[in-house]
Amino acid sequence: MGQKIHPTGFRLAVTKNWSSRWYANSKDFPGMLNEDIKVREYLKRKLAHASVGRVLIERPAKNARVTVYSARPGVVIGKKGEDIEQLRTDLQRIMGVPVHVSIEEIRKPEIDAQLIADSIAQQLEKRIMFRRAMKRAMQNAMRLGAQGIKVMSAGRLNGAEIARSEWYREGRVPLHTLRADIDYATSEALTTYGIIGIKVWVYKGDMLDRNEQPVAEEPAADDRRPRRTPGRPDGDKPRTRTVKKVDGAADPAKRVRKAGA
């Protein structure tokens, strides 16, 4: 059921890692999980125009470390670091512990699934044709080195009365291969006709460990036997059949046809 399950959850502890990394006992776990959800909602709302791909939350000892992966780190930091200081203050108020905020730049936003989904959603909200937005995103991803990409939109596409879903794929997207590095993300476009959901799968290559970089697949050598040409395999030469004689065996008796028989 690799086609149905969440690609990231399917690969956790194999080639993917958790987005929240901390341990807690049964008494503190619900509160800390609720804090993580509030932090992610706050960052999504606060940094809506900063092209945030993902957020990593870690809790070493009595502190917290929040890493924001963004394609526009300058927007997150702000002028002379004013915005990041305000961000740190708000996160400390939500989490109740000292928070260290770090910003990581996304080098290739064209192959980041979350940024692709958000970009398509923004274009749909600006009344751009959904097919054009999807195909443009796929072309950019393949040009920047993605091995394959699949994009699906669902809802009242082009303002149709009946909701439907359409998807396009380019290259390979092996969802059932555990070693395949599949980046998956979703987004929503709030249009005048209702919500349109966008799902994006990006195949970046194969990896054997969580800490390894994905490796692009090499095309397999074609070791199949050449196909026979129509007709006889050796041209017009008649086929000959060779019969091996077993040692000690008598020659087969010839059939003699008697006259008058």
UniProtKB/Swiss-Prot annotation:
Keyword rRNA-binding: yes
Record's compositionally biased regions (Basic and acidic residues): 221-254
Domain KH type-2: 39-107
Keyword S-adenosyl-L-methionine among UniProt keywords: no
Annotated stretches, region: Disordered: 213-261
Keywords, comma-separated and alphabetical: Ribonucleoprotein, Ribosomal protein, RNA-binding, rRNA-binding
Pfam families: KH_2 (PF07650), Ribosomal_S3_C (PF00189)
UniProt GO molecular function: mRNA binding; rRNA binding; structural constituent of ribosome
Domain of life assignment: Bacteria
PANTHER family xref list: 30S/40S RIBOSOMAL PROTEIN S3, SMALL RIBOSOMAL SUBUNIT PROTEIN US3C
Record-stated family: Belongs to the universal ribosomal protein uS3 family.
Quaternary structure and partners: Part of the 30S ribosomal subunit. Forms a tight complex with proteins S10 and S14.
Protein name listed in UniProt: Small ribosomal subunit protein uS3
Gene transcribed to yield this protein: rpsC
